[in-house]
């Protein structure tokens, strides 16, 4: 852990350079960062990061982040793989998946569904299946509602 000032002085210029290089090559800059990055998310966006992963559910307020940044960055929005997916019921996973879609998806796009990190080996297959099926069916239903 380090202060925002150290991040801005030491690391941000490197992210700006990486983002510029990616954009010069015609590709988006995707970035993964675990933990609570709310205080430096504006910096990442200003640096040119196009896609951020995962907006970790136990570390940040997903609803506030989605509302504030929805037209500024694309979210590689992650289902909670630490608690919900491995320990929740199938219905919990279905509800959590719908909430994730409702939180991050909007008419202009800006949401790619994923896991918030690696799926734990002890995760019940029924939960993984419920997550993927719900993401596909509810996500499709949501997209069709925008037309």
Residue ranges of predicted features:
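Active-site loop segments of alpha/beta catalytic cores
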Residues: 1-147
